[in-house]
Amino acid sequence: MIYWAQLLHFYQPPTQVPSVLKRICDESYRPLLKVFEEYHDARLTVNFNGVLTDMLMDCGHEDIVEGYRNLAGRGQIEFTGTGKYHPILPLIPREEVKRQIDLNIQTNRRFFGKSYAPQGFFPPEMCYSRDILLPIIKSGCRWIILSGIACPAEWPLDIIYKTESDGQEITVFFRDDVLSNRISFQELNAGQFIAHLNDWQGKRENIYVVTAMDAETYGHHIQGWERTFLAKVYEELQQPAHPLEEVKQAKVLAEQHATLLTNNEVATKIHMVTISQLLDLFPRGQTIEPRPSSWSTTADDIKAGNYYPLWQDKKNEVHRLQWEHLSICIEMAKEALECA
């Protein structure tokens, strides 16, 4: 059995103008919603930064929020936690990390309701350092997703790694960067993607693959990609006779998984799951120490200790001045709150 866990990241900056937001909604968010509603077997994990949720509600796009809320309500999607304003978490004070996480929970719970119950965490830009873990764990998240470049051990196909901070553990999933980027840059069609997954399985009875990318890839960055790629993949993976019941509880998949192991059969089917469902399907591996990184970090960047080159490049004087300015702003805001 091959389990495909797909994550889509929905975000627009607070400075985005309403006309551009409307275009993104019409080109991407609504067409994606229609695809998910058409293919009831589709399962995926989604991240909505709270600042985008606010803007959707403020700019008259409540139908999008309602649509994704309904999908979550019937177990087709799950939401993740994150920082509300898309902060680069390793580069901001720890108290601000906690505030951003809390603000995101408050905003998304307000608009998505009880359907917003994140078990996992998406750090913006997949920027990671060990010291962001504790506030994430304390927020109630069971897992975090990181870029594949952060994986310091053998690539996990049939085990799930974990990491820890101050004696508290959290599960770690790694994005398949190569596969995700090939999808994002139209280097694979639906048939090639499915063939790639089957090739990955090899002689293993059960494996999982995690892909993650910007939701705007579908329809906004690449016009019609939600139909020419995603819908075609879903079409191929539909269960023809007896579609799975709501698999949010993962029990059906777990039973099928166990049956395959018992009968010593090699599975050839691909099942779509949320990332959280993988927790019930695969054993835990060793405790690891992921590398500080982002989904834009290269191996050469890591060797140079330049872990976040798009935001804090060691040779970029503009970056240095921006962070100096931000530090001043944070201190001013803190003092203002103390005086209020």
Describe each model-derived feature in a short phrase.
Residues 2-93, 99-100, 117-123, 142-148, ...:
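Short, well-structured secondary-structure segments
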Residues 2-30, 37-39, 160-170, 174-177, ...:
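Active-site and substrate-binding clefts of carbohydrate-active enzymes
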Residues 29-36, 65-69, 98-108, 133, ...:
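Generic structural signal for well-ordered alpha-helices
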Residues 129-182:
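Surface-exposed loop and adjacent secondary-structure segments within mature catalytic domains
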Residues 97-125, 196-212:
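CE4/NodB-like, metal-dependent polysaccharide N-deacetylase domain
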Residues 39-42, 74-75, 109-116, 139-144, ...:
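Secondary-structure transition/capping motifs at alpha-helix termini
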